[in-house]
Amino acid sequence: MFAAEHTVEVYKQPGRFAGWPANHGIWSWGNEIVVGFESGYFHVRRPGEHEHSIDYKQPAEHLLARSLDGGETWQIEEPLGLLAPPGTKVAGVPTEAGGKPVADCPGGFDFTNPDFMVTFRMADVDIGPSRFYCSLNRGKSWQGPFRVPLFGQKGIAARTDYLVNGRSDLTVFLTAAKSNGHEGRVICVRTQDGGKTWSFVSFVTPEPEGRDYAIMPSSVRLPSHAILTAVRYQNWIDLYRSDDNARTWAYVGRPAPDTENPPSLLQLQDGRLALTYGRRSAPFGIRARLSSDEGKTWSSEIVLRNDGGCWDLGYTRSVQRPDGKIVTVYYFNDSPDHERQIAVTIWNPGLETHRKTEK
């Protein structure tokens, strides 16, 4: 049986819009969990306006939330090292002053350091530019911002999705602008010198037509060394697989056909996969699915929450605790006219057997 055991409030402030953990990233070390998110000013939208309820004229903070007890309680941190470069907007939202200019990365980072973190950030959702920051002490201090190359593309709109291959070797999944300059399609890139130089590896997805997009990847490496990458499309999530270390990709299936939200793909301790995402059509909320065959088939949808006030929610990121429970972080609302908050659902993924759905 799958049980959403309880929900925890991480960050909720009157008059604030807190959102988009999927853009920033999540990391865990046993029961210590760190997740990034953005906090701007709340702005009520008129009926029929399909825009986020954030004030696009006032600056937003880029924050971290840290839990030392498996997601039961949280402390909010505002690291100065994550301030955006001067004059930068993030997805159209101004940022706080005080950040450093973007520089070239000197390289030399040890990605196998157990306390290492890297977070990727963008300016514009279509063409970027993008940057990254590195921490060697679980997010207490940061180095950067460092420049993300264009890799021959018209733009890069980076979020945080990466796989550590070795001490100086990191594979990163990014969203590139399409040939028409709009978002986007997923690409794979790699550094083998600790972040100093980068090379283009592959396109993960075909290029969508017109204003359609394939963005916001979430990736895992299986015990077989194959890589699975879940990708957000307009209203659904598709899954791709590589068996040659990200050089070529094959379409696997569509695990979530109705989302309007990015995926968070997680490999569980027992080898299964967990996919979490927000649902932006009624009933609004947070959902999950499980797979025990490397993503070929998936369970029926698991309802973690169905009490959302409107579509403006989701962007999940999930980790598994040592006791096997899953901690799913997301942004949420209980009414279109109320602030957006960061919340957590702690849930039990149950036994290995589950009902399967078609690809």
Language-model region placement:
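Asp-box/BNR beta-propeller blade signature and adjacent active/binding-site loops
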Residues: 1-359
